């Protein structure tokens, strides 16, 4: 067995393990299901916070109304995440997800510290937004997974109330989940009380200090995004869906980083994170493959390459690369593998350098829908400069691809010419026979 075959076999084995992991699936799918909520909040933030003096003066009387959806979406996303992750995980175990989702929501809230304010003789207990947004996202993931798993465990142990026949299914399902729900709720209520007695003061503070800050520092570095890109591209070269594997691992970190930026942008504060999911999307997702399309369409002589370029161009404009990956193919192609792996990394590094030197702005963290085209996907991150940067990186990526494509193009063109010559000779021979 060759190295390539061994790598592919092992890679597919471990990739399938990651893809089949129920906890990873629940977190990834749970966050993905929140995309409509995140988009609502992102547009609310963008429309209320665009730094254009004339525009700000125009919307000043109703700016707070425009910003209101962001307060209950972006700044409260952890609440939605706690529900959706538990819902998805329960479903993966074959259980109805609604009750575990609500129990997870309760558990998350009961673990959330309540702030006390005094206004004269009036004492106000308030649930602030401090832990409901980006800072509470990792805690929401943990709570969502634990509550759903505990609920499933109690149901599997038959700790349920069985209703007699004839009771409507909706009522029967509600009562069957009552005991597991109460048990989980009691456990998390006790847990909340125990965390109050620790030096952290709450479960949220513990997760944020011990887990979320270190992971975001690690995941939000230029080195981590380059390594993730290299792994993703390498997996694609061996025919493994690299995006599914890599994004399943890094999406929670990148989402939290984006949410912090979006909240800072809305508040008019400097954005704290440079490398985020939005940064990845802008610089790694479009220009590299469009550079390949330019080479195929305008610099290649092979008819086959030109046809593949025409077929792949529309998808590449919207970040869809499979026609090129499998059409050329790039899969198991050692020559094209080199520029395919390197070009997005080069784009990311250049984007990073231009950002730290203040030539380009930091992306605001908007959750742009998948399929948003190049340029628009950059502009939606807060500046036209990002859209222009995407375009300017296309010729750079074309230069990276050109020498490698040229090797294959020359070979393909010679084969096509030889085939055409043979076909013409065969036609002439047939004409002589007929005449």
Where are the regions that the model predicts?
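Membrane-interface helix-loop-helix junctions at boundaries between adjacent transmembrane segments
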Residues: 115-185, 189-223
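Transmembrane alpha-helical segments and their short flanking loops
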Residues: 2-18, 60-63, 120-121, 259-269, ...
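Generic multipass alpha-helical transmembrane bundles of integral membrane proteins
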Residues: 182-300
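Early transmembrane hairpin of solute transport permeases
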Residues: 16, 20-161, 331
């Amino acid at each position: 067995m060759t190295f390539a075959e061994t790598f592919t076999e092992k890679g597919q084995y471990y990739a399938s393990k990651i893809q089949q992991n129920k906890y990873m699936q629940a977190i990834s799918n749970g966050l993905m299901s929140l995309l409509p909520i995140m988009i609502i909040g992102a547009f609310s933030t963008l429309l209320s916070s665009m730094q254009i003096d004339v525009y700000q003066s125009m919307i000043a009387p109703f700016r707070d109304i425009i910003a209101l959806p962001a307060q209950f979406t972006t700044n409260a996303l952890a609440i939605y995440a706690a529900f959706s992750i538990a819902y998805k995980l329960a479903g993966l175990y074959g259980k109805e997800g609604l009750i575990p989702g609500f129990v997870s929501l309760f558990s998350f809230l009961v673990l959330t510290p309540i702030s006390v304010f005094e206004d004269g003789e009036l004492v106000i207990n308030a649930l602030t937004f401090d832990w409901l947004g980006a800072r509470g996202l990792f805690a929401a993931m943990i709570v969502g997974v634990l509550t759903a798993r505990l609920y499933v465990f109690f149901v599997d142990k038959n700790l349920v109330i069985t209703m007699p026949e004839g009771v409507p299914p909706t009522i029967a399902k509600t009562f069957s989940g009552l005991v597991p729900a109460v048990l989980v709720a009691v456990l998390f209520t006790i847990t909340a009380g125990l965390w109050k007695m620790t030096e952290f003061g709450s479960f949220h503070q513990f997760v944020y200090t011990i887990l979320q800050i270190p992971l975001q520092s690690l995941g939000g570095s230029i080195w981590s995004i380059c390594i993730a890109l290299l792994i993703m591209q390498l997996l694609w070269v061996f025919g493994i869906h690299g995006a599914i594997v890599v994004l399943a691992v890094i999406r929670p970190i990148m989402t939290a980083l984006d949410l912090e930026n979006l909240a800072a942008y809305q508040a008019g504060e400097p954005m704290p994170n440079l490398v985020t999911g939005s940064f990845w999307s802008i610089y790694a997702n479009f220009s590299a493959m469009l550079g390949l399309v330019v080479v195929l369409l305008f610099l290649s002589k092979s008819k086959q390459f030109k046809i593949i370029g025409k077929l792949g161009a529309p998808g590449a404009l919207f970040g869809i690369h499979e026609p090129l990956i499998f059409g050329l193919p790039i899969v198991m192609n050692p020559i094209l593998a080199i520029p395919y792996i390197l070009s997005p990394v080069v784009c990311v590094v250049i984007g990073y350098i231009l950002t730290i030197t203040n030539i380009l702005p930091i992306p605001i963290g908007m959750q742009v829908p998948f399929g948003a085209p190049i340029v628009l996907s950059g502009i939606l991150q807060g500046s036209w400069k990002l859209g222009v940067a995407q375009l300017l990186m296309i010729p750079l990526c074309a230069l990276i691809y050109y020498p490698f494509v040229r090797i294959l193009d020359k070979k393909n063109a010679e084969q096509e010419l030889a085939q055409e010559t043979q076909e013409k000779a065969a036609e002439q021979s047939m004409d002589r026979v007929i005449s």
